[in-house]
């Protein structure tokens, strides 16, 4: 978004600071100032008031204007036909400059012209953004300015335009008030335009019947405000096209507060508006699109946002509509219209009710200053922003995250600054500013703390010397390929209706998302492999072994295997090959898993994964899965192996014993095998038979080893 540096300095009371210092502070606050452009190269212009207009008798299209300036009366010739007596103008007088041009008195068609009257385009504004009133000749306005004053200061024309790139999660930053508030906090100056209270002069009788999933707030205003010339110039600096009074007012509220607005007017006997979604077509487009319609009591459209605006009568009351539309719907409308306006862009961002509150608070101030009555907010209640989310404070963690030695005084001073932008602190917790959507974790607070504590303080930190280290090679892909698995990559995001979550992880619903099929972070990689397996089975591929490593919910890193060939016992062996840990397998009690064919995987009594098959309703009964949370496994220290002892070579023949376990259907053999595997010098334990007789599992294993192993087994069974 484009910002006027002059207006930011004015709002934040920073006139005493240099332009460069303020720009540097914006960068230190984390705002990317992508480009700095000077509005114009003008100096020496003056306010003047037209006293008399007469035609130059020696020219067809020249008018001689007698203009009163602060120092004297001058005659200036112009071709503009919109000059009016007793109106004020801006003028280059002798000695004024525009770039490399210096203006002098000059004889034109027999008469001296002591300068030149100024148009909006000559002030540095984009001609294509001007309406007919501003583009019909020279600038002409009511006589409200002191002729002694400097137009460059009064109209904020000696300005730098800052192109500031904001992060996607800072929609509140598309606002003069929010940026000015942060600057004022940074420089410790006064700022009072974001109040904590909103009022009204009367209660509106308007009823909004909302039949959509959007939120709609409104304010009834008794008269349409007319923006001052300096505020019209502010819109032009933001590359907003100048339109009628209603559009200009709505756009002004947008750039000041970040809240998109629309103006709506009703007949005197109507007090009800209905909001629906309905198809709309535009000229030269073959397709229609569903969009928002505001209807009157007779179901006639009053306003179709972004498609058709209502003409607002200047001296009649109207309603300022402040919507929070469905983000996906806005994205569809934006693509359909191939439009990239400031308002439509902001509508597509996830601003919260705090932005609406800032708009209402500013409107209180602005309308009172204009002496225009307004209602209490319609549909908006302060409770929408008073529900605060509190996060735990941990200053040791803060120091660790930032890598700084912070004193209690450093922390207290910085927190006082943060309170100016809306933070609330108590002894053990804090709540973020009511208008921010990006403060979800303690690390987000730490980032804000550093912005106001000072990024330059990081220079004082001495970096520790880090010795170069050659990373250990990752043999997992080679092992998995050797075992016959093929790697896959799936979407990180799933739809809301996909609830497969055997490990009961917590996911995050995204505030913005690409589609309804991708709205939250997946709970399980195995679930993604299941969908890929089914897709390949439909293509008549029956022998499938797949694996994937990736992120899942709760900041976990996971490995998942899926196979139509291998059994659960095979997957256990593969897990042992990949990670030489002593895993425990216990019966799985989960609504998502087949209790007779599934087990949870534990390591040191910590649940780290699952193995087996899913319940029948998912229709994946011929697929065996294994999923392990690598992020949990890596946190558990690996047990050191004992010292290696060499023994004399024994050339005697190995022997074996077959043992059969008789278990209930829901039981698993692993706990019993663990007892047997404690016998020293076992060479192998191999499954040789599995049958079900009278609802009992009969599982036969062959244990192979030297004489002493067989002796221990015989002793155990006797």
From Swiss-Prot:
Cofactor note: Binds 2 magnesium ions per tetramer.
CDD domains xref list: tRNA_bind_bactPheRS
tRNA-binding domain boundaries: 39-153
Needed co-factor(s): Mg(2+)
A Pfam family this chain is assigned to: B5
Domain B5: 386-460
Enzyme Commission identifier(s): 6.1.1.20
Keyword terms: Aminoacyl-tRNA synthetase, ATP-binding, Cytoplasm, Ligase, Magnesium, Metal-binding, Nucleotide-binding, Protein biosynthesis, RNA-binding, tRNA-binding
Listed GO biological process terms: phenylalanyl-tRNA aminoacylation
The UniProt record lists the keyword Nucleotide-binding: yes
Reaction(s) this enzyme catalyzes, per UniProt: tRNA(Phe) + L-phenylalanine + ATP = L-phenylalanyl-tRNA(Phe) + AMP + diphosphate + H(+)
GO MF: ATP binding; magnesium ion binding; phenylalanine-tRNA ligase activity; tRNA binding
Superkingdom assignment: Bacteria
Residues that bind Mg(2+): 438, 444, 448
GO cellular component terms given for this protein: cytoplasm
Compartments (UniProt record): Cytoplasm
Alphabetical list of NCBIfam families matching this protein: PRK00629.5-1, PRK00629.5-4
Family indicated by similarity: Belongs to the phenylalanyl-tRNA synthetase beta subunit family. Type 1 subfamily.
Subunit structure and binding partners: Tetramer of two alpha and two beta subunits.
Protein name: Phenylalanine--tRNA ligase beta subunit
């Amino acid at each position: 978004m484009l910002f006027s540096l002059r207006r930011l300095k004015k709002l934040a009371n920073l006139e005493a600071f240099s332009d460069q210092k303020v720009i540097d502070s914006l960068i230190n606050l984390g705002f990317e100032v992508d480009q700095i452009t000077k509005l114009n190269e003008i100096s020496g212009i003056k306010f003047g008031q037209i006293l008399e207009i007469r035609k130059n008798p020696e020219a067809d299209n020249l008018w001689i204007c007698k203009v009163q300036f602060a120092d004297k009366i001058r005659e200036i010739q112009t071709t503009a036909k919109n000059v009016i007596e007793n109106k004020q103008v801006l003028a280059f007088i002798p000695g004024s400059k525009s770039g490399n041009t210096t203006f002098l008195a000059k004889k034109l068609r027999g008469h001296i012209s002591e300068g030149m009257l100024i148009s909006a385009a000559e002030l540095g504004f984009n001609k294509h953004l001007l309406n007919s009133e501003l583009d019909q000749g020279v600038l002409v306005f009511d006589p409200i300015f002191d002729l002694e004053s400097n137009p460059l200061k009064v109209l904020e024309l000696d300005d730098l335009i800052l192109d500031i790139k904001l992060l996607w999660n800072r929609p509140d930053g598309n606002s003069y008030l929010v940026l000015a508030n942060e600057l004022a906090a940074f420089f410790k100056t006064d700022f009072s335009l974001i109040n904590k209270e909103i009022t009204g002069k009367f209660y509106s009788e308007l009823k909004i019947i909302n039949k959509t999933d959007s939120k709609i707030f409104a304010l009834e205003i008794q008269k349409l405000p007319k923006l001052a010339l300096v505020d019209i110039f502010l819109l032009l600096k933001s590359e907003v096209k100048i339109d009628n009074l209603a559009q200009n007012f709505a756009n002004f509220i947008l750039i000041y507060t970040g809240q998109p607005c629309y103006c709506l007017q009703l007949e005197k006997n109507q007090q009800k508006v209905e909001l629906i979604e309905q198809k709309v077509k535009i000229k030269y487009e073959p397709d229609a699109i569903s969009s928002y319609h505001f209807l009157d009591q007779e179901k006639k459209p009053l306003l179709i946002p972004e498609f058709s605006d209502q003409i607002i009568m200047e001296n009649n009351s109207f309603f300022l509509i402040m919507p929070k539309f469905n983000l996906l719907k806005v994205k569809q409308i934006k693509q359909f219209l191939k439009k990239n306006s400031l308002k439509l862009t902001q509508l597509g961002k996830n601003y919260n009710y705090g932005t609406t509150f800032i708009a209402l608070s500013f409107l209180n101030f602005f309308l009172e200053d204009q002496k225009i009555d307004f209602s209490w907010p319609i549909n908006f209640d302060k409770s929408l922003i008073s529900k605060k989310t509190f996060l735990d404070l941990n200053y040791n963690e803060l120091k660790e995250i930032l890598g700084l030695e912070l004193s209690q005084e450093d922390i207290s001073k910085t927190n006082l600054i943060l309170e100016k932008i809306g933070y609330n602190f108590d002894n053990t917790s804090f709540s973020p500013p009511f208008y921010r959507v990006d403060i979800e974790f303690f690390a987000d607070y730490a980032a804000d703390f550093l912005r106001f504590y000072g990024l330059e303080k990081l220079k004082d930190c001495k970096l520790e010397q880090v010795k170069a280290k050659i990373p250990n090679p990752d043999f997992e892909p080679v092992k998995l390929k050797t075992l016959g698995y093929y790697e896959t990559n799936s979407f990180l995001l799933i739809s809301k209706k996909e609830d497969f979550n055997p490990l009961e992880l917590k996911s995050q619903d995204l505030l913005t998302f690409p589609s309804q099929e991708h709205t939250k972070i997946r709970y399980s990689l195995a679930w993604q492999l299941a969908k890929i397996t089914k897709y390949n089975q439909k293509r008549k591929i029956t022998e499938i072994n797949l694996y994937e490593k990736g992120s899942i919910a709760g900041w976990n890193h996971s490995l998942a295997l899926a196979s139509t060939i291998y059994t659960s016992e095979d997957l256990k062996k593969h897990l042992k090959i990949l990670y030489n840990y002593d895993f425990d397998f216990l019966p799985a009690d989960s609504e998502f898993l087949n209790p007779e064919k599934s087990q949870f995987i534990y390591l040191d009594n910590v649940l780290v994964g699952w193995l087996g098959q899913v319940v029948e309703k998912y229709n994946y009964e011929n697929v065996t899965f294994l999923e392990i949370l690598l992020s949990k496994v890596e946190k558990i220290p690996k047990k050191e192996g004992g010292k290696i002892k060499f023994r004399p070579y024994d050339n005697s023949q190995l022997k074996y014993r077959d043992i059969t376990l008789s278990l209930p259907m829901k039981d698993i053999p692993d706990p019993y095998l663990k007892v047997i595997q404690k016998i020293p010098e076992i060479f192998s334990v191999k499954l040789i038979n599995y049958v079900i007789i009278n609802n009992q599992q009969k599982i036969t294993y062959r244990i192979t080893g030297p004489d002493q192993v067989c002796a221990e087994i015989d002793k155990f069974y006797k």
